[in-house]
Amino acid sequence: MSANYTLLAGAEEDLRDIIRYTRKHWGTAQTRSYVAKMQRGIEAMAAGQGLVRDMSALYPGLRMVKCEHHYIFCLPQNDAPALVVAIFHEKMNLMTRLADRLK
């Protein structure tokens, strides 16, 4: 976790699943590299940098960024760390899973 974002329980579980899957299929070195890229992507999005897409039409304040093969969704907060709500693979049914996560 970084000072500029907090992984909510669902996003933390998503990240653990990504780590397990990547380690199983591509090994430890690739896992470290991929997770480091994801962390940089999350930090940039939380700081309002990079190619962040405004998803407020779906949920107030929601932001999304694509990082490698995953979409990361977060809710920026005033004077508090951004809340990362989900990290979904590009082949998942993003909107259905996101709707479940934002309930």
What are these regions (language model features)?
Residues 40, 50-82:
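Basic/aromatic recognition patch in beta-strand/loop cores that engages polyanionic ligands
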